[in-house]
Amino acid sequence: MHCLWDLPEVMMQANAWPLSSSLGREWHVPGPATQDGLITGLYDEAISRTSCNLVMQALIFMKKYPVQGGPEVMEMPRFWHPNFNWYGPAGIGSARGIKGFRDWHQIPFIAAMPDRGLYPKETSAHFFAEGPYVAVTGWPNMAQTISQAGWLGIAPGNTKITLRSLDFWRVEAGKIRENWVLVDLLHVYDQIGVDALARMREFNKSRTGFDPDTGQAL
């Protein structure tokens, strides 16, 4: 069993996050709505392969935008449930539905880094699936240049960065219903010369501790 710590969320819970506010909703991200993420039965290769192929096709179409045209080239209604839940990491936040996903994550993300997906030789992606669940990881699995404004309040300094992430999807009735996206944001900030942990210490050095009744940082 492995544990993935979302350190920015820990900072937020302590009211000590030192960087920009999230565009999406910040909350305690839930597990699968179907509560069946721990699979104990036999591995179903056919269902797993179908789920994995759906997600991989969805990603292929998403990378067509914006190089090959407007949002329509992604054909999102073909792959994504209209009210799918997109759970981003703390610092980005969560969104619901195609419009919510685009408004609160995709549009500012691609506007700031329009060369997303143009450096496949510099990244890796390892997909695996079981039943309706699909996952991918790469260290890194994205590379792009912050050439425009609009993402996380970062100034467009033409800095090329990589993103290390672990993504999960849940497929339901042939559509992606939930998507968990874990991005190492502290590493992103480090690449542009921002030490988030040092900023946290500097901004919070006068605080005295925690309220024993509420657990809130003072």
Spans of features found by a protein language model:
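C-terminal and inter-domain tail/linker signature
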Residues: 1-218
